[in-house]
Amino acid sequence: MIKVAPSILSADFAYLADEIKKIETAGADWVHIDVMDGAFVPNLTFGAPVVKNIRKVTDLFFDCHLMVNNPEQYIDDFADAGADMVVVHAEATKHLHRCVQYIKNKGMQAGVALNPASPLCLVEEILPDVDMVLLMSVNPGFGGQSFIETTVPKIARLRKMINDAGLNIEIQVDGGINDKTSKQVREAGATVLVAGSYVYGAADTKAAIASLKA
């Protein structure tokens, strides 16, 4: 089943509760929460206190994507705030296995993310321990970027690795997702699609979300 996880990075922060209710009513499956520290990526967004507050307005699955250095130091905060899944970058921690296990020990699902130029071998050894791999299809840090086409064969290679290992792992794709690129990544094996500007910039939010699954 294909899941759509709108990124609230593209929402109107002045009306964040309303923006989340809007995507929930329109058929979103998850809420994708982009956490940036201004160091691992060249931008700052929000942290666990915002997650804790928006947790009060929806029961949707919270997928927290930590684009931060040394993510270990923030895991407790996001667990306490009500995150359902925490995704860390393989490039951002020296002890990926330990980090993933700590996330799971806190009662959350664990995901690992890769930047566009990072090879799949960085996650190969951790696959049996994760619930999801996030492949970035733009360089992280800002919304509204163009889709990097080489992500499509990368998704297919990852799906083969997962299937060959007999594992059941979601593949999430984030960056430049719209009604056209969504078809490409789904056919390659992606199961969770992150879309920010395509969903929040649409005149008809429900139709935009539906088009990502069509």
Residue spans for each PLM region:
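Conserved N-terminal beta1-alpha1 strand-loop-helix module at the mouth
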Residues: 1-87, 91-95, 102, 110, ...
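Helix C-cap/helix->beta junction micro-motif
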Residues: 58, 106, 165-167
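Short, electropositive alpha-helical surface patch
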Residues: 83-91, 186-195
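Short, acidic/turn-prone active-site loops that include or flank metal/cofactor-
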Residues: 91-93, 115-117, 138-141, 197-200
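Predominantly soluble domains enriched in secretory-pathway, periplasmic, or organellar proteins
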Residues: 100-102, 118
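Short acidic loop-to-helix transition motifs that present clustered carboxylates
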Residues: 117-119, 178
